[in-house]
Every structure is written in C-alpha cells, then in structure tokens.
C-alpha cells in the first residue's frame, strides 16, 4: 500500500526563476503595510490604549455567560468589550476601552466601573464583583514600549543565532523574512482595524517562531547541498534545496491550518484577532522563507566556498613552497 504523498519525490519547481518579481512584490507589500500603520494606525486594545478591567465571579452559575456579558456591556457605549473567562469557568474578566480623559481621571474611571457593575448586577443575581483596575494612558504606553522591545530583542537574537550557525548572509536573509512577516501582519491589523492587544504580540512571536523554523530547515538543506554539489550554480542549488524540503513545508503548513481554521471560523470573538494573525503568518511565513530568505543568498554572494574551512597563512605558504598554488 502506497502512502499518500502531497509532494512527489521528483518535484522540480524553479522557484528562483521568479525571484526578482516576487521579491519586488514583498518589498511593495512591506511598504504598503507600513503606510497603513502610519496613516490608519493600529486599533489598540485596553492593554495598549488604556481602559478599564472588571473582574467578577458568578456564585451560582457553572460557566460565566461570556457572550451575553459582551452584549450587555456593549449596550453601555464602551465600544467593543473584551470578555474572557479566567481561573475557574465561573470567573470572568471584562475589559473596555475608555477615552483618554476618562482613563486619566480616577473618579470618572471608577464611575464607569460602577456603571458596568450595576448594570450586570441588575441583570444577573449571582454576579459578584471581585475587583476592578484602571489602565491609564501612561501605563499602556509603557506596555507598547515593552512589547516593541520584546519584538526587537527576539529578532536581534534570531539574527545573531543564524549568523553564528550559518554565515552572515543567512542572518540577513532570515532577518528580512521575519521583518516581512511582522510587517504584513501589522498591515492586516491596520487595514481591517482589528483590535491590537497583548494577545497579538504573542501571535506575532508565534509567527516569528514558525517562520524561523521553516527558514532554518531550508537553510540547513542549502548548507548541506553547498558542500555536496560544489560545482552547481547557486540558484539551481537553492531550487533543489527548496524542492527537497517542500514536502515537509506543505505538511507542516496544512497541519497547522487544520487546527487554525475551526478556531478562525467558529471560535470565540475574543480569539479571532490572534487566530487571524497566526493564520496569516502561516502563509506569509512560508512565502518569505522561499521568496525572501532564499533569493537574498544569491544577491549576497553565497557560494560553496562559504562553508569550506579557511586555510591558515602557514598552510598557504607551505602550498606555495611546494608549488601547489
């Protein structure tokens, strides 16, 4: 019985033949994404824009009615609230965005919290307030700064790791691919004005991890083939390496997609942004590994000599003395 193969063994797609137009498309998409970020801006959630969090417990209900709570709070005019269970199933966290002037005024913020609590207590007899916190604009600004530092540190550490493990050209290629993936994710959030919260930072870090893993698999095969086929042209060798790892790439992507699509289509609204980000990252991460990370190696002059140990000056002198050079 033959096993089903998504990618035949003799697959030979000339990926690098179209490296220039596809790389140009990548650059244009990056530019468009950042243009959207700077013109439309990101729709920051409570974590990054400031707001109010109310924590409560339903004393006589096994599971907190998250959907109904979201609808109830939305009628109060606080925008699109984020309602999530935490701890036990009957415990809930309700987060709403507040205008900057309200968030900065403790009394006004407390009045908003009281408004939410009184409305929900009138609707649910077993609604018990556990506490509430006001996230000011200053604190949310610190969150944004910390998140930015985390992303930059992750990308810097990754570039250094690739540089040490392979060659500096590989580090540049991997870093560009990651920048491509993060940029397109931010562009999607700016275009559709999806809420940008700490959950999305976690999603972006997951995207970076997936894209990096895919890139390293291809890079590792490229390194092996550079040592094995020393006379082969680099573009042809890169095509060979990508085709040899294509089955693994397709299988990994499809497996993740099978897990993500049900969450994207039928999951709770509170997870939609995070799942959408990871789903997009799945596609752009695969694309960038092939059409961004690999072509850069050609333009930066990677050859089979890149992985041949350099001879010392003494060895070169000895070869010259023997007339071998």
Predicted regions and their residues:
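A structural signal for conserved, well-ordered secondary-structure elements
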Residues: 1-325
């Amino acid at each position: 019985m033959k096993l089903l193969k998504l990618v035949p063994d003799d697959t030979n797609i000339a990926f690098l033949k179209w490296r220039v137009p596809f790389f140009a498309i990548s650059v244009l998409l990056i530019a468009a994404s950042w243009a959207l970020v700077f013109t439309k801006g990101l729709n920051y959630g409570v974590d990054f824009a400031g707001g109010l969090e109310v924590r409560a417990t339903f004393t006589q209900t096994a599971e907190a009615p998250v959907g109904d709570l979201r609808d109830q709070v939305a009628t109060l005019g606080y925008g699109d609230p984020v309602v999530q269970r935490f701890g036990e199933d009957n415990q809930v966290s309700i987060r709403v965005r507040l205008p900057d002037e309200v968030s900065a005024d403790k009394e006004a913020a407390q009045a908003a919290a009281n408004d939410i609590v009184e409305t929900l207590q009138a609707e649910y007899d077993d609604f018990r307030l556990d506490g509430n916190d006001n996230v000011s604009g200053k604190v949310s600004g610190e969150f944004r700064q910390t998140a930015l530092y985390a992303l930059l540190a992750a990308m810097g550490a990754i570039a250094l790791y690739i540089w040490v493990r392979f060659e500096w050209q590989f580090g540049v290629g991997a870093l560009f691919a990651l920048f491509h993936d993060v940029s397109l994710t931010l562009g999607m959030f700016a275009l559709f004005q999806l809420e940008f919260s700490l959950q999305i930072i976690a999603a972006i870090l997951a995207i970076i991890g997936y894209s990096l893993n895919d890139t390293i698999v291809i890079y590792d095969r490229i390194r092996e083939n550079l040592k094995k086929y020393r006379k082969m042209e680099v573009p042809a060798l890169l095509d060979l390496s990508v085709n040899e790892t294509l089955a693994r790439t397709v299988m990994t992507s499809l497996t993740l997609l099978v897990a993500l699509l049900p969450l994207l289509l039928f999951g709770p609204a509170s997870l939609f942004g995070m799942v959408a980000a990871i789903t997009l990252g799945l596609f752009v991460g695969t694309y960038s590994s092939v059409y961004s990370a690999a072509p850069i190696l050609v333009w930066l002059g990677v050859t089979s000599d890149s992985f041949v140990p350099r001879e010392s000056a003494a060895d070169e002198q000895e070869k010259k003395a023997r007339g071998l050079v």
